[in-house]
Amino acid sequence: MRKITAGLFISLDGVVEEPGEWHFPYFNEEMGAAVTATLGAADTVLFGRKTYDSFAGAWPDREAAGGEDAPFAKALGDARKIVASNQKLELTWRNSEQLEGDLVEAVTVLKNEPNGNIALSGSVSVVRQLLAARLLDELHLLVHPIAVRNGMRLFDEAETPIPLRLISAESFKTGVLNLVYGPAESTADATYEDAKAFLAQPDQ
């Protein structure tokens, strides 16, 4: 079964919208390595339409320009790219296709194919649905030390909590935290009566 990972730039107050407006001051070699590791380990990239349009509007030109980011751009171009959208799309970036049918059903089929990892970058609406369906194996959050204070947040209002477990954590020189979470079983019921035993006792 294929592993599905999602990587997101996120502010301290949970904003994931328009990261290009606030995250570049924190981008360094550590973050570059983290992003490359997530996308580079996948042979398939799953996008929402807006994120795909952003990538397709930049990375083919960067590959053609032959600059220092050209190898990464080529790897993205060579990967299979699947775009989730309710609209009929004209996809011009090579190796791109539109996801057909229900997102959760289609991704379930993809997950069971005998290929490499599937990665998402951004694509918040897709990430939300895959988290809720428990199809996401790893959620990579690059938490920036800034409160953006406006914009869409990763988790929307819903009735059902999504329990997660921390797989790994590291801090970058810029103050960014690289947190990797995976799905967890539902937390047990507990109250303050259960918690108070763990409070530090004052010195007598």
Identify the function of each model-found stretch.
Residues E138:
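A contiguous pocket-lining binding segment that forms or flanks enzyme active sites
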Residues M1-L135, P145-Q204:
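Portal/gating segments that form or line small-molecule/metal binding sites
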